[in-house]
Amino acid sequence: MTLQDYIERATNGVDLSHETSRKAAKLLFEDATEAQIGALLTALRAKGETETEIAGFARGMRDAARTITPDRTPLVDTCGTGGDDYDTINISTTSAIVAAGAGAAVAKHGNYSVSSLSGSADVLSVAGADVKAEPPAVEAAIERDGIGFMLAPVFHPAMKAVIGPRKELGMRTIFNILGPLTNPAGADAQVIGVYDPDLVPVLGRALTQLPVERALVVHGSGMDEIALHDTTTVAEVIGDNVDGYTLSASSIGLDSAPVEAVAGGTPEENAADLRGIVTGETTGPKRDIILANAGAAIYVAGLADDIETGVEQAATAIDTGDAKATFETLCEPNSASTEQK
C-alpha cells in the first residue's frame, strides 16, 4: 500500500492496524511530501487516533531512532506529553534524578520546551548536564551512573521530516503523544504524564502493544504529572493488564497543596529549584510533588511495593544525600569527581 492509500483510509474513517500504522510512520519519515504528511496527520486527528494506531506509530518511530541497549534492568523513564495547563517546576526531570538516587536505573528521554517555559533539556543544560550527548556516551552513563539523558532530536533525527508540517498545521497531532512511547533505550518501566484525562486509558492500552512491562499513565487534574492540588487519574499497566484508579496526595502520605505552590519559571529558576530539592534545601509542596512522582517511578522500577512506600524511599534518597550525588554525577561531573577523591 502507498501513503496515499493510508491517507484515504483514515480520511474515510477507517482505523489503521498496528502494522499498517507502523508502515505509515516509516513512509512519513522517508518518502512523504509535506502535503502528504499534513494530510495523514489531519485525517487521523479528525477520525480520532486509536490505541492501536498510537502503538503502531510509536513502533515506527522506534524503528527510525538511534537506539541504545544499556545493560541495566528494568530501565525507568519519567516522561510526559507536555501541553498541560500549568507552568510548573520541572517535575519529571527532578523526579528522575531522585528515583535514580533511590536505586532505579533511569533512561530519561526529553526535549527542549515546546509549550512551557522550561523543558527537561532546558533545565538540565542550565544545571550543567551534557544534554546533547551521543548514544554511546548515554549508554555508558546509564550503566556506570544509573542515569542518562537522551535528547529527542539527537536520538530521533527522522523527526526532522515532520517538523514543518506540524508547525503549519498548528494543532495537536498523534506526534504530541508519541514522545513518552518512543524511549530510545527501550525503557520497560515508565511513568507517563498526559495533558488530557481521556488519554489515560488510551495510552494505557497502547502500552500493552509495546515492550513495556510496567507503567503508570497519569493525569493530575490539569497536570501531566501526579498532582497535589486534586486527584490524579491513573492507568496502571502490568504486562497486558490495565487497571484504572484515582489517587490523592493523602493516599500516598503527602499533604495537598495548591498548584500555585509548585509554579515554575525560567530554566535558570527551575534549575535552582531542582538543585534545592535534590540537596534537601527546598521543602514543602515543591519537594512533595517530586516525592510523589519519584515515588511512582521507584514503584514501577520494582523497588517498592506501592507508591506510598516509593515516596518514603524518595525522601530517604534526598535526606541521605544519594539524590544530590546523582544530580552531581549527571549535571556537575567535575564537582562529583572532586568530592570522590
UniProtKB/Swiss-Prot annotation:
Source organism per entry reads: Haloquadratum walsbyi (strain DSM 16790 / HBSQ001)
Q: What gene codes for this chain?
A: trpD
Q: Does the keyword Transit peptide apply?
A: no
Keywords (A to Z) from UniProt: Amino-acid biosynthesis, Aromatic amino acid biosynthesis, Glycosyltransferase, Magnesium, Metal-binding, Transferase, Tryptophan biosynthesis
Sites where the protein binds Mg(2+) 2: D224, E225
Binding locations of anthranilate 1: G80, N111
Q: What does this protein do?
A: Catalyzes the transfer of the phosphoribosyl group of 5-phosphorylribose-1-pyrophosphate (PRPP) to anthranilate to yield N-(5'-phosphoribosyl)-anthranilate (PRA).
Against InterPro entries, the record matches this protein to: Anthranilate_Pribosyl_Tfrase, Glycosyl_Trfase_fam3, Glycosyl_Trfase_fam3_N_dom, Glycosyl_Trfase_fam3_N_dom_sf, Nuc_phospho_transferase
What does the entry's cofactor note say about binding and number? Binds 2 magnesium ions per monomer.
Keyword Phosphoprotein assigned to the entry: answer is: no
Regarding protein family, the annotation reads: Belongs to the anthranilate phosphoribosyltransferase family.
* GO term, biological process aspect, one: L-tryptophan biosynthetic process
UniProt subunit comment: Homodimer.
Q: What is this protein called?
A: Anthranilate phosphoribosyltransferase
